[in-house]
């Protein structure tokens, strides 16, 4: 395994990616990565697309692929081929930050090995420590809340290996359709599982099926999601915006900002809701604040350019 690194606050994404890249001889650390995609320490979320952006723009000799709807078998196949794999999952914090805090958060985990006889993965956990032993069933339970996303970073000469392991999942549309069906079967297994409904919504958003996605998200919210969930996943903002459900969008972005006042994604989508209602000054203020929270947030820069270009 690569040399383990202890994460700074809210920095599991850059730290896990740094350990991953060091596996291939890269010479940087979490600060190198965070300086581009998370310039402010208070930024509590780094999403998969931001990690992808870093590798593609700063580490051109490695490639980055991510897919959803994964399973234990595909993780093992990558590891057996000598390729570590990174996932995003649930995490239980050991302290509360407000009254009745459910202490739920998101976390990245870098998997570097497995033992089939004992049914455990080995993970390099930037918060807990190196060489953590994680039972297969526990991993799947924690992984489900993030649509079972998996990330593979690899040298360009390993592309054929990665393609053969992914098989039809190399095609992103096929992969999403598979994840959509997996979410539906999770719902059948337990109709009261909010993550299954949320994943269904997210996979529907991928196919621009916004009205159906909004219904699935409604169900997830009605059953009950963790308090910080919208700090990390933004599909509902898109579904409500594109299906014209602005009241829901305002309610949800306000709730997200109550929990995470510097969430650039919630600010962005509240800005778009304001724009759709013709409140240009409020929209511009939201977009500017989003950019202030993350000066490298290109979606907010795009939004400002769009509004200034279409007053």
Enumerate the predicted regions with their spans.
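Terminal, low-structured helical/coil segments at or just beyond the last alpha-helical repeat
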Residues: 284-311
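Alpha-helical adaptor scaffolds
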Residues: 202-211, 218-273
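Noncatalytic regulatory segments and standalone regulatory/sensor domains
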Residues: 98, 102-103, 112-207, 212, ...
């Amino acid at each position: 395994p690569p040399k383990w690194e202890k994460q700074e606050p809210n920095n599991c994404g850059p730290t896990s990616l740094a350990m991953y890249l060091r596996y291939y001889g890269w010479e940087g650390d979490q600060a190198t990565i965070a300086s581009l995609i998370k310039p402010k320490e208070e930024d509590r979320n780094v999403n998969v697309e931001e990690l992808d952006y870093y590798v593609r723009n700063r580490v051109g000799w490695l490639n980055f692929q991510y897919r959803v709807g994964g399973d234990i078998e595909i993780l093992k196949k990558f590891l057996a081929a000598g390729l570590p794999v990174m996932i995003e999952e649930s995490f239980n914090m050991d302290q509360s930050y407000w009254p009745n805090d459910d202490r739920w958060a998101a976390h990245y985990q870098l998997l570097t090995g497995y033992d089939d006889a004992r049914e455990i993965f080995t993970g390099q956990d930037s918060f807990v420590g190196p060489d953590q032993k994680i039972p297969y069933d526990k991993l799947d339970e924690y992984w489900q809340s993030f649509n079972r996303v998996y990330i593979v970073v690899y040298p360009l000469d390993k592309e054929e290996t990665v393609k053969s392991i992914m098989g039809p999942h190399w095609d992103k549309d096929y992969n999403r359709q598979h994840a959509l069906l997996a979410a539906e079967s999770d719902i059948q297994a337990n109709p009261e599982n909010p993550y299954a409904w949320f994943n269904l919504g997210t996979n529907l958003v991928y196919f621009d099926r916004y009205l159906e996605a909004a219904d699935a998200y409604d169900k997830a919210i009605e059953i009950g999601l963790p308090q910080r969930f919208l700090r990390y996943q933004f599909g509902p903002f898109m579904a409500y915006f594109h299906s014209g459900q602005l009241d829901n969008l305002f309610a949800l972005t306000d709730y997200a900002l109550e929990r995470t006042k510097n969430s650039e994604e919630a600010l962005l989508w509240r800005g778009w809701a304001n724009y759709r209602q013709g409140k240009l000054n409020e929209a511009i203020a939201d977009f500017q604040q989003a950019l202030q929270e993350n000066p490298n947030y290109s979606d907010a820069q795009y939004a400002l350019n769009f509004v200034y270009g279409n007053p």
